[in-house]
Amino acid sequence: MTDRYAVFGNPISHSKSPFIHGQFAAPTQESLTYEAILAPVDGFEASLTAFFNAGGKGANVTVPFKEQAFALCDSISPEAKLAGAVNTLSLLADGTIRGDNTDGLGLVADLIANLGSLQDQRVLLIGAGGAARGCILPLLNAEIAQLTISNRTHTKAQLLVDIFTSVDNGAYASKVTAVEMSELAGEFDIIINSTSASLAGELPPLPAHIITTQTVCYDMMYGASVTAFNQWALSQGAAKAIDGLGMLVGQAAKSFTLWRGVEPDTQVVLTLLRDKLMAEPK
């Protein structure tokens, strides 16, 4: 029997998820289909219910439904709880829905694939939206030395710090801080841009001196050409600049493993996806 999976979003026609999961399924001999479903902005719950009633086993969720999906879950993972959003839904044997957030796990997996280890790294996270919030716990669990969060609106960055310093009886309190962009100083091993500024060819207002020849920069956005943030980082002398395509594949792999109990080969699929992206009409 072929199991059915999908990704829900609005818009959704641009989604790479059907291609990614199709590539995961073939070599692992998993019998499944995976489709993109456009849900009405005011009709996500009805669309999801219809999907599960028709035999759907699990689903990914993207903009703008991640918070709505969170509210529909009967149980959630620690990552999803702290992110306040889910991107992966699983219909369990008892008919309940479990929610996970694999975005941050995908980010960490891609960083480790590129850098080897995140242990004792000093990390600067730019942005304080949902993308940033979803990756904080996985970064901390990767045993980084320090996480600095900086955002155009400082109060939003401080709010994230307050949330995560209260986790596990303050276990992370000494590791997470919020700093105004204009007051950023010192050196960072890794700088992660979680904002969508690159999609518009724009940059967060960052001081150039935070980039050194040892700094690795990571933009969660991606495209056929180098993103605006990564162009800027390289022009300032960064050691390396990585885009978010590997994060996309990584989070999909974590979802696939949750559903199927099989770990797919992400690097092969990442290469195929990169080639596909480069071949698309500009």
Curated annotation (Swiss-Prot):
The organism of origin for this protein: Shewanella baltica (strain OS195)
UniProt superkingdom: Bacteria
Protein name (Swiss-Prot/TrEMBL): Shikimate dehydrogenase (NADP(+))
Gene Ontology MF annotations: NADP binding; shikimate 3-dehydrogenase (NADP+) activity
Cross-referenced InterPro entries: Aminoacid_DH-like_N_sf, NAD(P)-bd_dom_sf, SDH_C, Shikimate_DH, Shikimate_DH-bd_N, Shikimate_DH_fam, Shikm_DH/Glu-tRNA_Rdtase
Listed PANTHER family: BIFUNCTIONAL 3-DEHYDROQUINATE DEHYDRATASE_SHIKIMATE DEHYDROGENASE, CHLOROPLASTIC, SHIKIMATE DEHYDROGENASE
UniProt-listed Enzyme Commission number(s): 1.1.1.25
Pathway the protein takes part in: Metabolic intermediate biosynthesis; chorismate biosynthesis; chorismate from D-erythrose 4-phosphate and phosphoenolpyruvate: step 4/7
Iron found in the keyword field: no
Biological function: Involved in the biosynthesis of the chorismate, which leads to the biosynthesis of aromatic amino acids. Catalyzes the reversible NADPH linked reduction of 3-dehydroshikimate (DHSA) to yield shikimate (SA).
Assembly behavior: Homodimer.
Active site: 66 (proton acceptor)
GO annotation terms (biological process): amino acid biosynthetic process; aromatic amino acid family biosynthetic process; chorismate biosynthetic process; shikimate metabolic process
Alphabetical keyword list: Amino-acid biosynthesis, Aromatic amino acid biosynthesis, NADP, Oxidoreductase
Binding site for NADP(+): 127-131, 151-156, 220, 244
Reaction equations catalysed: shikimate + NADP(+) = 3-dehydroshikimate + NADPH + H(+)
Entry similarity comment: Belongs to the shikimate dehydrogenase family.
Gene Ontology CC: cytosol
Top enzyme class: oxidoreductase
Record Pfam families: SDH_C, Shikimate_DH, Shikimate_dh_N
Binding site for shikimate: 15-17, 62, 87, 103, 222
